[in-house]
Amino acid sequence: MPRKNDVHEMVIYHKKGTYIRPHKHLGKTESFLLISGEADVLIFDEDGNLLKARNLGKYETGKNYYYRIPDSCFHAQIFRKDTIFHEATKGPFDVNSTINAIWAPKETEYHLVKDYMKNLESQLKLLLK
């Protein structure tokens, strides 16, 4: 019988502007270690209100390059540049432990994503004031 992995690790590449629907992982924290590029990690409450944002950049930039998302917390990223990062979370991977935010459009709802991202950018500006 195959051994289940205790840690789920990935090196991920996303192009600037890639949309990932906000989601949470039940019973799991998640960490991001930025390798190259620039991205904002966003934390939301259960209703989709933006609570916190952290801008990540390469180590050499002096920006934060690591962020750990708390357990069962809705989150998303805004990719400011083409970005490569290392992501780690508790394994094994289980698609059923990921809950997508009902208040955010699916990746395939292109006509809604543009307006959602515009609104999110407005919330982000207010939060960072």
Language model regions located:
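Short beta-strand His + acidic residue motifs that chelate non-heme Fe in jelly-roll/DSBH
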Residues: 21-23, 41-43, 67-69, 75-80, ...
